[in-house]
């Protein structure tokens, strides 16, 4: 009898454990994503191609993507014996590359009519120091009527890439960009700007004025601040920017035209702590401004890690109220697009 009793108790415990696991899995949230920051090509203007992107989207519940090029091309210099693998691979410079938008346009135009509504092309192939760039963007809007749904990612302050790019250092508040912001407002286009909030070593918001001035001067232009001004390179020298949270809190209150892209360098060390748990202060900020944050993968031309990048936000999303989590995961990006853009609620790619 004691043996039978022990067996019954063991079976009961095993059954209870299975029920708890099942219940936990059943209650786990499933998200449909919009990737608000995806580069179809890399820094050599090469890509794994649309079939692989479509597969990655379908397999990972990524319904919509912002799709853009890379506004610079990395040079393989005459003096370099080996082709670099990344822009930081050697000291050769990068140069502004307008054909990146042609590559994106060609890829999107080859999609089927059923696939097209899930791709949202952004223009990026222009020199942000050139006051002719606004005219170039206008020409691209006319050459591809109805195609472009935003501008960016515009590279301004961008770590070592700033030093490697030929010409002057771009600023988000220069005259050339001012013309572009006016054009964006006239055409109802959001603008994604990469503008570092500080340098690698300064522990203060050294360059904040460069992004805050356009926000103040162009209230009718919708700005997506890429990575909230942070970068992986900054974090190599400064593990965490202590001033970032209070700065964002103030700016989101002051500028209703500011939206935050949480890709690349925001998940850690900001949204999640060292144990991978959501930070309460960041949850509170997103809850206070539930329509102002969006997710992105920031992949460049290769899509094998697309799902991993997007799903890595799940611990943070799970700690938010479900309605807010779905806004951040999918809806907020769609809401910032031009009113004329088709914002399909279907999930044809994920069936």
Locations of regions flagged by a protein language model:
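Hydrophobic faces of well-ordered beta-strands that scaffold small-molecule active sites
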Residues: 34-38, 65-67, 119-123, 150-152, ...
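N-terminal secretory signal peptides that target proteins for export/translocation
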Residues: 1-10
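An N-terminally biased module of ancient metal coordination in phosphate/nucleic-acid-related enzymes
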Residues: 28-106
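Acidic-and-aromatic substrate-binding clefts and catalytic sites of carbohydrate-active enzymes
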Residues: 41-49, 72-76, 94-100, 126-134, ...
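Bacterial N-terminal signal peptides
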Residues: 12-23
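Catalytic pocket-lining loop regions of alpha/beta-barrel enzymes
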Residues: 112, 158, 165-294
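Active-site gating/metal-coordination segments in enzymes
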Residues: 31, 81-199
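Mid-to-C-terminal alpha-helical segments outside catalytic/metal-binding sites
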Residues: 13, 30-36, 45, 49-68, ...
